[in-house]
Curated annotation (Swiss-Prot):
The active site is at residue 79. Pfam families: Hexapep. This is Chloramphenicol acetyltransferase. GO terms for biological process: response to antibiotic. GO terms for molecular function: chloramphenicol O-acetyltransferase activity. The gene is catB2. It comes from the Bacteria. Belongs to the transferase hexapeptide repeat family. It comes from Escherichia coli.
Length: 210
């Protein structure tokens, strides 16, 4: 099978890959999938991608997504563990014995990934999860609960390891929301973005936005 990626050292922007209308992506977010060989569309695990009522995968800007990351979509995918059987009879209703089966599909709500989020290789995000801006998801983490902004999580199930910055610094970053700035403003702020000088960037931003 031909590898969708030419090199393990360079990802591709999601805007260049995504064809599924249920996946919404921001600017400059990328997927580096060389070691798994497929485009980002295959990272979103939909049961029926053309259904009108499926949950959406919404990804912000400037996100970094490692090879083999998976987003489990389409709600419960037709399995009801509160019924006698979790088997999805409805999706095999061409079988006469299953003709009276009921569609067990339930939405979980949209999966929303904030901006400037780093998702490690082979991490798995469960349905309906919300991941805050600036979060870091460790490789092979199984994320079954929402993740707060600028929080590093890892493990199975994923648990909080630590915050990236102090609460005051996180408040500054969320207030600035640099990922929404025009490119020219980002260009001018690049020396600050590539440093740990959050307070300095915040003071500069306050001066330009006054």
């Amino acid at each position: 099978m031909t590898n969708y990626f030419e090199s393990p050292f360079k990802g591709k922007l999601l805007t260049e890959q995504v064809k599924n209308p249920n996946i919404k992506v921001g600017r400059y977010s990328y997927y580096s999938g060389y070691y798994h060989g497929h485009s980002f569309d295959d990272c979103a695990r939909y049961l029926l991608p053309d259904r009108d009522d499926v949950d959406q995968l919404i990804i912000g800007s400037f996100c970094s997504i490692g090879s083999g990351a998976a987003f489990i979509m389409a709600g419960n995918q037709g399995h009801r563990y509160d019924w006698v059987s979790s088997f999805p009879f409805f999706y095999m209703n061409e079988e006469p014995a299953f003709a009276k089966s009921v569609d067990a599909f339930q939405r979980a709500g949209d999966t929303v990934i904030g901006s400037d989020v780093w998702i490690g290789s082979e991490a798995m995000i469960m349905p309906g999860i919300k991941i805050g801006h600036g979060a870091v998801i460790g490789s092979r983490a199984l994320v079954a609960k929402d993740v707060e902004p600028y929080t590093i999580v890892g493990g199975n199930p994923a648990k909080s390891i630590r915050k990236r910055f102090s609460e005051e610094e996180i408040s500054m970053l969320l207030d600035m929301a640099w990922w929404d700035w025009p490119l020219e403003q980002i260009k001018e702020a690049m020396p600050f973005l590539c440093s740990s000088g959050i307070a300095s960037l915040y003071r500069r931003w306050q001066g330009t936005s006054a």
